[in-house]
Amino acid sequence: MEAVKDVLCMNNGVGENSYVKAEALTIKVMAITKPIVPKAVQSLFTETDHSIPLQVVNVADLGCAVGPQPLEFMSTVIESILKKCGEMGREMPEIQFFLNDLVGNDFNTLFKGLSVVQEKYKKVSWFAMGAPGSFHGRLFPRNSMHLVYSCYSVHWLSEAPKITNEAGLPLNKGKIYMSKTSPPAVTKAYLSQFQEDFSSLLKFRSQELAPNGRVVLIFNGRQTADPTNKDTCYTWDLLAEALSYLVSQGLVDEGKLDSFNVPYYNPSQEEIKYLVDKEGSLTIEFIDTIELEIGGPNGYWSSPESRIRGHRCFTEPLLSHQFGERLMDKLYDKATQILVEDYKHGKEATKNIGIAVVLKKKKL
C-alpha cells in the first residue's frame, strides 16, 4: 500500500456519499465541545504581555477536511477574539487561518465555502490559506502559532502498523482493525504506532507554538482499558465482515483482505496523559471524555442507511485504494444489510466516544 499521506482523505465533492453531505457527526461533536475554543482564546489574551498587544493571531486547523466544520471553527475563533478584545478595550488583531490537511483533501470545495465567513465578518481583517501536509511532521515556523486546533483527525495514524509473523505472513487475517479475535501482537502493534505518532505530534506542535499559545485536540477515543471493545471496533468489524462476504463470492482476493489494516487508533485518557507526560514539552490544561449516542432508534444515526453513509464518507478512499473502486457499492450495500440485522437484534455499537484535551507549552 502507498504511504497513508498519499491515500487518506475524506470523500471529495458534494455528492450523496461526500464528506460534505454525509458527515455530520463531527459537527455534533464540535457543538458539544464549542466552549473549549473561547476559553483557549481567552487564556491567550489574558496571559500575553499587555504592553505588547497581539497584532496578528495565527490559527491552525489540523486535518480540517471540508464542509461546514472548518467554517464553523473559523467563525467561533473570530467571535471569541471579537468578544475578548471588546471586554479588554483592545484593538482587534488580524487573524491568519492555516487550513491543514493531506494533499488529497478537497481544498477547492473548502475554499469555495469561505464566502460564508467572508459575508459574515466583512469588518474583520482575517485571512485564510491552505497548508497541505501531514500533522505528524512539522508544518509551521517555530514559536509562530497561537492556537492549534484539530477535531476528529489525530486518531488517524501516519501508517498502518506492520502486523506479520517472523515469516512475513499476516497475523490479523479476515480483519482490517483490532478485534476480539485478533492476536495480542495486533493490539501491541497498534498501540506502538499510536505512541510513536502522538509523541511526534506533541513534539512538533510544541516547537510551533507561541508563548501562551494553546493546542486543542478532539478525537475519537475510548472509555475502557480494552482497545477492542464494541464501541471502538464495531465499524471496522462491520466492514471486515462485508469484505469477507465479497471474498466468499470471489470478488475480493483473500490475501488483500488479510494484509490490510486501517491506520487508526482510539486512545484512552490514560494513554494520552502518559504520552504527554513522557514527551514532556507540553502540559495538560484540560481533558474530558465526550459520549454521544449514535445507534438504536433514539441514536444520532437512527437508520442503518444514514449510518453507513456516515461511515462511507471517511472510509471509502482507503478501502477503494486497496480493494478497487468498482466494488465499493457492493461493499457498502452488504455492510448496510449486516447493519439492518444488527439493528433488529440490538447488536450494533450505540456510542461514539471522544476525548477533548487542551495543551499548553511548559515554561522553561
Swiss-Prot record:
* Pfam families, alphabetized: Methyltransf_7
The pathway this protein participates in, as annotated, is: Alkaloid biosynthesis
Requisite cofactors: Mg(2+)
What's its top-level EC category? transferase
Q: What are its E.C. numbers?
A: 2.1.1.159
Q: Site positions for Involved in substrate discrimination, renumbered to this chain?
A: Y149, N220, Y264, E325
Which controlled-vocabulary keywords does the entry list? Magnesium, Metal-binding, Methyltransferase, Transferase
The UniProt catalytic activity note for this protein reads: 7-methylxanthine + S-adenosyl-L-methionine = theobromine + S-adenosyl-L-homocysteine + H(+)
- In this chain, S-adenosyl-L-homocysteine is annotated as bound at Y19, C64, Q69, D101, L102, S134, F135
Chain's role: Involved in the biosynthesis of theobromine.
Query: What name is this protein filed under?
Result: Probable 7-methylxanthine methyltransferase 5
